[in-house]
Amino acid sequence: MPAQTHISKLTLTNFRNYAALAIDLAPGAVVFSGDNGAGKTNLLEAISLLTPGRGLRRAPYADVAREGGDGGFALHARLDGPDGQVEIGTGISVGEGEGGRRVRINGATARSAEDMLEWLRVVWLTPAMDALFTGPAADRRRFLDRLVLAIDPGHGQRALDYEKAMRGRNRLLTDGSRDDRWFEAIETQMAETGVAIAAARAELVRLLAAMIDRLPDTGPFPQADISLSGDLEAEVSSAPAVDVEERFRRALAGGRDRDRAAGRTLEGPHRSDLLVRHRPKAMPAELCSTGEQKALLVGIVLSHARLTGEMSGMTPILLLDEIAAHLDGGRRAALFSILEELNCQAFMTGTDAALFSSLMGRAQFLTVDHGTVGPTEDA
């Protein structure tokens, strides 16, 4: 069984509506309840920033820093894991811009935010993701890449490198440049990183599909059939990566006039999509009811949590924002049971603590009240 990694203490300074907060946390289920706008999701956002990226809201750091503060913010977490305790801190100082985020691990400055993935993996579900299957493909790619990152820590940097190269190519296209050497250099980098991204996505989908197949087909959360739509993802499953890179590089070179007319790059992993079907109903997820879509999404995340534990040797930390609002009583009880079985730390939020009543005695209940957090009465 994977070793549990959990946050035992979380400290926030000038973060969102928290001027200063320090809370001790239990290793299993943690329930944050309180009124809308009290700051429950802010706590989940803080935890989500203990991994690379902009967190579950994808907000600019200027928005994350507390209004009325000095413009900076700091987060600190004490982790208890298989290798003992680890201290992780991140934030920005006063006057630092969007690129000024710093990470410290056990007091030492980390090389990059990716170093945090050595110590914890975090995956989240938020109400904004309820429209994942009916919304734009970009949202599904972002969700997929977050799942990949949890088992392949290098994926985030590859995605950043690809995006940077593509922005450079798009600038050349819109500027009307005909400098073949510049194009060739950028397109070579796009081919290398783009194929690596596609291969990582394809591998994640293969592994996750196999994990879903291992689970009972009569469970509370319907099994999903998942696949990828994209030329590169299809090719890397059947051809050597070096051959796919060369094909993609030639396609980029041959498509310059087309892309110049469009003003952007029209081929690559940034155009791919994650396809999901409700297996029992043999129906595309986007055609399912809202409740069925939510159940499918929860099932995928729980299967991914199992996969992450097996692949990394540590249980992921789950952030489940307003998770109980759209699940019936049976599925809520099933979710809580599965979380216990996974032995992972799971942070859940809701306006009504009663929705989590079946967890009484088995979870830590905390009430959030506009900048303060304390034990929930009668919990």
UniProtKB/Swiss-Prot annotation:
Subcellular location field: Cytoplasm
Keywords: ATP-binding, Cytoplasm, DNA damage, DNA repair, DNA replication, DNA-binding, Nucleotide-binding, SOS response
GO CC terms of this entry: cytoplasm
NCBIfam families: recf
Broad class of the protein's primary localization: cytoplasm
Source species taxonomy: Bacteria, Pseudomonadati, Pseudomonadota, Alphaproteobacteria, Hyphomicrobiales
Function according to Swiss-Prot or TrEMBL: The RecF protein is involved in DNA metabolism; it is required for DNA replication and normal SOS inducibility. RecF binds preferentially to single-stranded, linear DNA. It also seems to bind ATP.
Organism domain of life: Bacteria
SMART domains for this protein: AAA
GO biological process per UniProt: DNA replication; DNA synthesis involved in DNA repair; double-strand break repair; SOS response
Family designation: Belongs to the RecF family.
Protein name (Swiss-Prot/TrEMBL): DNA replication and repair protein RecF
